[in-house]
Amino acid sequence: MATSGSRNFELDLAEYVEEAFERCGMELRTGYDVRTAKRSMNLLFADWANRGLNQWTIEQTSITLAEGIRDYPCGTLTMTVGASTSFTVGETITGGSSSATAQITSKPSSTTFAITIPSGTFTSGETLTGSGSAATTTLSVAVDFSDVRSTVDILSAVVTRSSTDFEIQRVSRSSYLDIPNKSQSGRPNEFFVDRQITPILRIWPTPENNTDVVKFDRLTRIEDVDSATDTVDIPFRFYPCLTAGLAYYISMKRNPQMMPMLKSVYEEEMQRAMDEDRDRASLRISPSYDYYRD
């Protein structure tokens, strides 16, 4: 008999839910069953983010630095405006009706700004005024924070100058606080991740030009499941783990007697998946030729 030749087995949300209910000793019957299971699955993904590194959710992000600005969003944060050409990188823009403020870190196009985390909330349609250039424009759409807020953590970072990458070291909150002169300028060599709801990348020394680029590998949230026909943002290695975890979460609400067994299966599947989802690198061992002579 011939094998199938296919390697594309994939479940959608409804099929995961059906399997999870069966593991709980029940049948999927109502629309509410799907809704409560969808909620449980999204909560399960939050648990995975707390458990450690999910390799498939790592993204590399690049941000062009601006002279004199040391705080940046941990992701892509832009404003779509009527025109950006008359504004200056590094200046502060202020909303005419909201009084919200942010600094321009770069101008990716003639109708966009890359900005720092705003103070206040800009309003779509309001007039923006530059502090130095006195230029004005209109904000076309509300600022979207979803990309920045999807960042769970930053794993590593470099600063690129003249096509050369220079590693920058991560420091703790207390170490960053202890820096006596945070305004000192130079090529950045340290960073601190301020893990707010909208996380901030704080770098030091403060950038000395508008051409250096910080590149960082960030761990991001797993994509939500929103409808029964959605496929799930995980590699196939995690299919058993997701099914076991969803069954365990559903059992808390529908069949508590099954919880101990389902939790045990989930933890076993989770450990197996996490052991596999890791970096691999070559290990080289060199013998030492030192010796003692009597």
Model feature map: region roles:
Residues 1-76, 138-294:
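Glycine-enriched, solvent-exposed interface loops adjoining structured elements
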Residues 52-142:
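Autoprocessing Asn-cyclization modules and mimics
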